[in-house]
């Protein structure tokens, strides 16, 4: 997850409160000092940190927690609300026909962001197109075209044309059937008159509905001055923070943007076109504190299911597993769906009670090992017969040896696959006996288990955030 170090540090501080029936002033002071240290290490502005810590301390000492709420959960709620306020609101971005222009300096990640945003809009049922107008950077056209192909979206660019305004004009005509047109522009080492003039000329031509500034998270609190400079020069409607997975300064960048008149539209991390998320303050902070994000999780599951079912000749329906026999084919489809959801550590962070504190306790390579096992299982199933995939119980010693020879995997891995299937089959049988009321109670228990194991009872539920926001 993005901002891993900050999240781990904040969760560790709050976990120190477990088991305490009441908090003294000294306890609160210690908590505030640890939160200050965590935020300063994330390059959050000193003044912002001081204001936030003062607010947390005042509320923790003066406000009375609801009956039945533990001191830890009450402080957790206060920290959650103050952090949501710190990072600000999300940029308004309706799912409708529009033209978006991206601006930013060299190396901020504009071209990658254009492809990621286009992919994101495509998952919402819209037809996006990328218009590449950068004629200055060598390779900009090729990179943009390649990433558009990865995102499976329309693309326009002209490597033989030197005038970015003409490319923009021609691009609008070529992509007139698109719902969302994303115009990528050139960058510079700094915001100079030449860049401002070029962006203004392109803006005058395309008349974008929204101008988004792309900022590298590594800028930390310096993002404030850059956002303010671009706002003063060309006007911006929102910000995209990129490369959050590669720096400890992401928290500073998020907080800095909120200090200006800007808001955040998207967060980018990773190298694939799917490594982008719409910035939702409540869900983002909820994950940061280890409380999960059911809204983001639901969206990922639905999208992954659609991708898994695309081109499926057997018309696989996961609900069938609750009614009949669970086969290795079903297990394989589940694995494909999990893979389509993205990195496992990100998925785990979205599940209340499984992310946060639990993830902190796992070895650094735990998710890589799990991903590797899933890949091995897939290779092993390629070497199985139709009968074995439909009925794994027929796989004995001789068949295991044959499967090992065909897949190149050790017998131990084949046995792991069969054991994993058996465990999942037993779990599904338990679900088969559940009524709707049982399922609802189970989901409620999961949500109340957020915060790395501490209950959230008596603190509200539903809505966007874990506290009913």
Curated annotation (Swiss-Prot):
GTP binds at residues 104-111, 184-188, 242-245. It catalyses: GTP + H2O = GDP + phosphate + H(+). GO terms for cellular component: signal recognition particle. GO terms for biological process: SRP-dependent cotranslational protein targeting to membrane. Its EC number is 3.6.5.4. Keywords: Cytoplasm, GTP-binding, Hydrolase, Nucleotide-binding, Ribonucleoprotein, RNA-binding, Signal recognition particle. Disulfide bonds: none annotated. GO terms for molecular function: 7S RNA binding; GTP binding; GTPase activity. Composed of three domains: the N-terminal N domain, which is responsible for interactions with the ribosome, the central G domain, which binds GTP, and the C-terminal M domain, which binds the RNA and the signal sequence of the RNC. This is Signal recognition particle 54 kDa protein. The lineage of its organism: Archaea, Methanobacteriati, Methanobacteriota, Stenosarchaea group, Halobacteria.
């Amino acid at each position: 997850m993005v901002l891993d170090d900050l999240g781990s540090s904040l969760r560790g501080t709050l976990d120190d409160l477990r088991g305490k029936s009441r908090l003294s002033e000294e306890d609160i002071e210690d908590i505030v000092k640890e939160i200050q240290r965590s935020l300063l290490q994330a390059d959050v502005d000193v003044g912002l940190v001081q204001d936030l810590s003062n607010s947390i301390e005042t509320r923790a000492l003066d406000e009375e927690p609801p009956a039945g709420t533990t001191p830890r959960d009450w402080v957790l709620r206060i920290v959650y609300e103050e952090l949501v306020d710190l990072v600000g609101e999300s940029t308004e971005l309706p799912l409708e026909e529009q033209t978006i222009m991206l601006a930013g300096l060299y190396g901020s990640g504009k071209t990658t962001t254009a492809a990621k945003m286009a992919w994101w809009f495509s998952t919402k049922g819209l037809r996006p197109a990328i218009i590449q107008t950068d004629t200055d950077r060598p390779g900009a056209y090729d990179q943009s075209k390649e990433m558009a192909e990865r995102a499976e979206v329309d693309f326009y660019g002209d490597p033989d044309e030197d005038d970015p305004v003409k490319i923009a004009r021609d691009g609008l005509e070529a992509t007139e059937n698109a719902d969302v047109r994303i115009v990528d522009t050139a960058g510079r080492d700094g915001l100079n008159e030449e860049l401002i003039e070029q962006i203004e000329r392109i803006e005058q031509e395309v008349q974008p509905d929204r101008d988004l500034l792309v900022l590298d998270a590594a800028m930390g609190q310096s993002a404030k001055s850059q956002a303010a400079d671009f706002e003063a020069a060309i006007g911006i409607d929102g910000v995209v923070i990129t490369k959050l997975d590669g720096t400890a300064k992401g928290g500073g960048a998020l907080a800095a943007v909120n200090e200006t008149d800007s808001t955040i539209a998207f967060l980018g991390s990773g190298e694939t076109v799917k490594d982008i998320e719409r910035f939702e303050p409540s869900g983002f902070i909820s994950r940061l504190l280890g409380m999960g994000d059911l809204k983001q999780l639901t969206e990922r599951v639905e999208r992954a299911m659609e991708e898994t079912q695309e081109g499926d000749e057997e018309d696989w329906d996961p609900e069938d597993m609750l009614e009949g026999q669970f086969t290795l084919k079903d297990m394989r489809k589940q694995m494909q769906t999990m893979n389509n959801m993205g990195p496992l550590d990100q998925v785990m962070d979205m599940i209340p009670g499984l992310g946060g504190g639990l993830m902190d306790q796992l070895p650094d390579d735990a998710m890589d090992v799990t991903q590797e096992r899933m890949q091995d299982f897939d290779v092993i199933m390629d070497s199985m017969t139709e009968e074995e995939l439909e009925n794994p119980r027929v796989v004995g010693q001789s068949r295991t040896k044959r499967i090992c020879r065909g897949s190149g995997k050790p017998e131990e891995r084949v046995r792991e696959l069969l054991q994993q299937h058996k465990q999942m089959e037993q779990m599904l049988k338990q679900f088969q006996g559940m009524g709707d009321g049982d399922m609802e109670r189970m989901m409620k228990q999961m949500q109340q288990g957020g915060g790395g194991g501490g209950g959230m009872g008596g603190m509200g539920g539903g809505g966007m955030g874990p506290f009913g926001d």
